[in-house]
UniProtKB/Swiss-Prot annotation:
It comes from Danio rerio (Zebrafish). This is Cadherin-5. Coiled coil: none annotated. InterPro entries: Cadherin, Cadherin-like_dom, Cadherin-like_sf, Cadherin_CS, Cadherin_Y-type_LIR, Catenin-bd_sf. Pfam families: CADH_Y-type_LIR (PF01049), Cadherin (PF00028). Ca(2+) 2 binds at E62, E115, D147, I148, D150, D182.
Length: 767
C-alpha cells in the first residue's frame, strides 16, 4: 500500500506567515502519515483489500530561487515500492519545475511565477525499472503556487473625466481604475487610492470614485484640473507597492454668461447704390461661454426694422444688412440703437450689468445713379385694327441725383410695333396690329441721361392686343357631308359647324345663301347645322356636282358674315350609311391667290421683254453713232511655220487644210458681211486679188497652219451688246487718217506701210 505525506502550507494573512513556517518545519516527520491496508487471513483464502489514496494540495511560494539540494514540498509512499521500482512524475512542470527523488520526495527545481501559472496538475506513478511496466496505476495531485507582493498597481490608460460647471457638491466625476497582478484575495492584490493634490475641491473613495467637493466650479475661471492620484496595495500597512498617475478633470461649459457688445458705437459707410440684401458690417459681441452655449438675439429700434436687418453669424455675432435701397438725397446719415439679449441663460449670469446696448451710425455716400422709372413694369392694352389715336400710354423716369439731368427715351428693338417719344415718353403705335397674328408684345424702353456718357436704365413694357370682331366665320366639318344612293327623303346626311378666329364669338347662325331643290339646312341653335335630304334618287353615275352655298353669321359687333361652298358627294353606301365608294369631281375652278400669282408672272415676263427690246434699240443707236476713230481692226498673224502645240491640240490640221480639195466643204458664196473700205493707196496690186492668192496658197499647203487662222474683223453685226470689235471703220469713206509715219518704222513694217500708204487713188475695193 502507498502512503503519502505532504507539507501543508495554507494561505493565510501575512502576519501569520512566520507561525506557518515554524509549524511546517516541525511537520516534516509529523505530517507524514501512513495508510496501510493490512490483509486479513482467513482459513478459506488470502484476500487483498482495495487501496485508498488520499492526496492533499501541495504548496510552493513563487519567486523562490532554486536551492541545492532542492526544496522539498512533499513525499510519495507506496507499499509496492522497492529497490527495483522508482517514482515518475507526469503533468504540468514535471522534470523542469518539479521532480521526485529516488525515495519519493517531491522537490522544486525552478523559480515559479504565480502570475504566469498559479496551479500545476501532476500525476505520480510507480514503475518497475527492469521490465518498464507500471507497478500501480497513476494517481493525480495539485501543486498551488503561493503569492508574494511582487507587483505594483497599474492604472488604466485613459484617466480623464468631466463635470459641468456649477454642479452640486458630491457629484461623482469619474471612477479611477487600477489593477494589481497579485492575488486579489490577499492584501497583496488589494488597492487603495489617495489624492496627492486638489483635496480642497475633490476627494476619492477607496473604490476609486472621484467626487467634487464644491459647487462653484467655473469653467470661465479654470476649465481643467490635473489631479495626482496614488494607488497602493497592502492597505492599512506602511509597506506595500504604489503607483501614481495624473487624472484630467475637464469642466464642461453651460450658458451662464450673457453676450455683450465689445464697443459702445459701431460706424459704417455705405454707398447709396448698395443692393438690398447686401451686408453692411459686423457687430461683434463678447460671450465667455463656448460657442454652442451662446444664444444672443439682436433687436433694432422699431422705425429702422424696415430699412436694416441683423442676422446671427456662425460665430454668434450680429451681421447688419440692408433691406431697402438707401437714398443719399433723402437722408445722408442713419443712427439707431441695437440691443443684444440672451434668454437661455441657465442661472443668474456671471457678467450681469455689462454693455448690452450699442449705437450704430451709417453714413450714406452719394453715387451717380441711373434714371429710375416710376414703375418696375408697364402694361398697356390696345384694340387691334385701324386706330384713330396712336398713343397707347407713357412711361416716366427721373434722375434721382441732385443734378437732375434731363431724360431721353428710346426703344432699341427695330421690329417693335411701338415708338416712344424721346422727350416725354409717350408710346404710340407704328402700324396696325392684328391680334390673330400676335396677341402680346413685350419690349424694353430705355431711359438715359441727356449728357455725355450719361447713365441709363431700362424697364419692360407689355402691350396686350384686344380683339375686335374683324374675322368672318368659317365652315367646319364639311368633309363629312355626303349623300348615299339609297338615302330617302328627310334623311340627315351630315352636320356642319363653324369657327371664328376672334375671341368670345357669339352664337353662329346658319342659312342657305341660295335655295336648293335637293337639300335643306336646319340651324340647331348650338353653333351647328344639319343638312337634310329633300328627295332621293341620287346615283354615282350622274356626273352632276352638288354644291350648297351656306351663309354663316357670327352675331358679333359688328356682325361678320361669310358664304361658304359645301360640296356634297354622292356615294355608294352599305347598311348604316357606311361609305363604300364616292364619286370624285374634277375641280375646274381656281383660287383667287392662284389667279393673282399667274397674273403677276405674266406682267413680270412682259416687263422683261420690253426692257430687252429697249436695250437693243439703244445699242444699235450707239453703234451707228460711233466715230470712225473708235472702230479699230485687229489683225492676227502667225509668222512661224505652222501652229504651236496649243493650236494643234484642239483640231485635226489635215481635215482643216483639206477644205480646198473637197468642193463639198467649200463655203457657199453668200452676201458680203463686211463693210466696204478704201483700198490702200500705196498698194500696187488689187487687194482683193492678193487676199484670194494668199488664201489659195494656204489651202494647198498641208504643212502650214489652217486657213482660218487669219482673223479679220470688219464688222460684227448689231446683235452684240458689247458693240463692234473692229479696229477700222471699213464702211466709212473719205478717211482723214494719215499713215505715212509707218514708213519711218523701218523695213520690217514695209508691207504694213504699203497697205496703209496713200497713192492718190480714191477707188474702193471690197474684201
Amino acid at each position: 500500500m502507498m502512503k503519502q505525506c505532504a507539507r501543508r502550507q495554507m494561505t493565510e494573512p501575512v502576519f501569520r506567515v512566520a507561525v506557518l513556517l515554524a509549524l511546517c518545519s516541525l511537520s516534516i516527520g509529523v505530517d507524514v502519515h501512513q495508510a496501510q491496508k493490512t490483509p486479513s487471513i482467513s482459513s478459506a483464502a488470502l484476500q487483498r483489500h482495495k487501496r485508498d489514496w488520499k492526496w492533499d494540495k501541495l504548496y510552493a511560494y513563487e519567486e523562490t530561487r532554486p536551492k541545492n539540494p532542492p526544496e522539498k514540498i512533499g513525499k510519495l509512499e507506496n507499499t509496492f515500492f522497492s529497490s527495483s521500482t522508482r517514482y515518475i512524475l507526469k503533468g504540468d512542470g514535471a522534470k523542469d519545475k518539479f521532480g521526485v527523488t529516488d525515495n519519493g520526495d517531491i522537490v522544486v527545481l525552478a523559480k515559479l511565477d504565480r502570475e504566469t501559472q498559479s496551479v500545476y496538475n501532476l500525476s505520480a506513478s510507480l514503475l518497475n525499472i527492469h521490465t518498464g511496466e507500471l507497478v500501480d496505476k497513476d494517481e493525480s495531485f495539485v501543486i498551488v503556487v503561493l503569492d508574494i507582493n511582487d507587483n505594483i498597481p497599474v492604472f488604466d490608460s485613459d484617466q480623464s473625466g468631466s463635470i459641468s460647471e456649477s454642479s452640486r457638491a458630491g457629484t461623482t466625476i469619474m471612477k479611477v481604475k487600477a489593477t494589481d497582478a497579485d492575488d486579489s484575495s490577499t492584501e497583496n492584490g488589494r488597492i487603495d487610492f489617495k489624492l496627492l493634490n486638489g483635496t480642497d475641491l475633490f476627494k476619492i473613495k477607496p473604490n476609486g470614485d472621484l467626487i467634487a467637493l464644491k459647487s462653484d466650479l467655473d469653467r470661465e475661471k479654470q476649465s481643467q484640473y490635473l489631479i495626482a492620484v496614488q494607488a497602493k496595495d497592502m492597505p492599512e500597512h506602511l509597506t506595500g507597492n504604489s503607483a501614481t498617475t495624473v487624472v484630467t478633470i475637464n469642466i464642461k461649459d453651460i450658458n451662464d454668461n450673457i453676450a455683450t457688445f465689445k464697443k459702445e458705437r459701431y460706424q459704417f459707410t455705405v454707398k447709396e447704390d448698395l443692393k438690398p440684401g447686401s451686408e453692411i458690417g459686423l457687430l461683434e459681441v463678447e460671450d465667455k461661454d463656448e460657442i454652442q452655449n451662446k444664444d444672443p438675439t439682436f433687436a433694432l429700434q422699431s422705425k429702422f426694422n424696415d430699412v436694416f436687418d441683423i442676422k446671427r453669424t456662425k460665430e454668434k455675432d450680429g451681421m447688419l444688412s440692408l433691406k431697402v435701397p438707401l437714398d443719399y438725397e433723402k437722408e445722408k446719415t442713419h443712427k439707431f440703437i441695437v440691443i443684444v439679449e440672451e434668454h437661455t441663460v441657465s442661472r443668474t449670469p456671471d457678467n450681469k450689468g455689462l454693455l448690452k446696448r450699442t449705437e450704430v451710425i451709417i453714413d450714406v455716400t452719394d453715387v451717380d445713379e441711373p434714371p429710375i422709372f416710376n414703375q418696375t413694369e408697364y402694361t398697356f392694352s390696345v384694340f387691334e385694327g385701324p386706330f384713330k389715336n396712336p398713343v397707347i400710354g407713357a412711361v416716366s423716369a427721373k434722375d434721382p441725383d441732385s443734378a437732375s439731368y434731363k431724360i431721353r427715351y428710346t426703344i432699341e428693338d427695330a421690329n417693335c410695333p411701338v415708338d416712344v417719344d424721346p422727350v416725354n415718353g409717350y408710346l404710340s403705335l407704328k402700324r396696325t396690329l392684328d391680334r390673330e397674328q400676335e396677341s402680346l408684345y413685350t419690349f424694353q424702353v430705355t431711359a438715359h441721361e441727356d449728357v455725355l456718357n450719361g447713365l441709363k436704365s431700362s424697364t419692360m413694357v407689355s402691350l396686350k392686343v384686344l380683339d375686335i370682331n374683324d374675322n368672318a366665320p368659317e365652315l367646319t366639318n364639311g368633309s363629312y357631308v355626303y349623300v348615299c344612293e339609297n338615302d330617302k327623303p328627310n334623311t340627315i346626311i351630315g352636320t356642319i359647324g363653324a369657327s371664328d378666329k376672334d375671341e368670345n364669338s357669339g352664337r353662329f347662325r346658319f342659312t342657305l345663301a341660295r335655295k336648293s331643290s335637293n337639300f335643306s339646312l336646319y340651324d340647331n341653335q348650338d353653333n351647328t347645322a344639319t343638312i337634310v335630304l329633300k328627295q332621293g334618287g341620287f346615283s354615282t353615275e350622274n356626273s352632276e356636282e352638288y354644291v350648297l352655298e351656306i351663309e354663316i353669321a357670327d352675331g358679333g359687333t359688328p356682325e361678320q358674315k361669310s358664304v361658304n361652298l359645301l360640296q356634297i358627294k354622292v356615294c355608294t353606301c352599305q347598311s348604316g350609311r357606311r361609305v363604300e365608294y364616292c364619286m370624285s369631281y374634277a375641280r375646274t375652278g381656281m383660287s383667287v391667290s392662284a389667279l393673282l400669282a399667274i397674273l403677276l408672272c405674266i406682267i413680270t415676263i412682259l416687263v422683261i421683254v420690253i426692257l430687252i427690246v429697249l436695250r437693243r434699240r439703244y445699242q444699235k443707236e450707239v453703234l451707228v453713232t460711233k466715230a470712225s476713230g473708235e472702230i479699230h481692226e485687229q489683225l492676227v498673224r502667225y509668222d512661224e511655220e505652222g501652229g504651236g502645240e496649243m493650236d494643234t491640240n484642239g483640231y485635226d490640221v489635215s481635215i482643216l487644210s483639206s477644205a480646198c480639195h473637197d468642193s463639198s466643204f467649200r463655203p457657199s458664196v453668200g452676201p458680203a458681211l463686211y463693210a466696204m473700205v478704201k483700198k490702200p493707196p500705196a498698194c500696187k496690186g488689187d487687194m482683193a486679188m492678193m487676199i484670194e492668192v494668199k488664201k489659195d496658197e494656204a489651202d494647198r499647203d498641208r504643212d502650214g497652219i489652217p486657213y482660218d487662222t487669219l482673223h479679220i474683223y470688219g464688222y460684227e453685226g448689231t446683235e452684240s451688246l458689247a458693240g463692234s470689235l473692229s479696229s477700222l471703220d471699213s464702211s466709212s469713206s473719205g478717211s482723214n487718217l494719215d499713215y505715212d509715219f509707218i514708213h519711218e518704222w523701218g523695213p520690217r513694217f514695209r508691207t504694213l506701210a504699203q497697205l496703209y500708204g496713200v497713192d492718190g487713188s480714191d477707188s474702193d475695193s471690197s474684201y
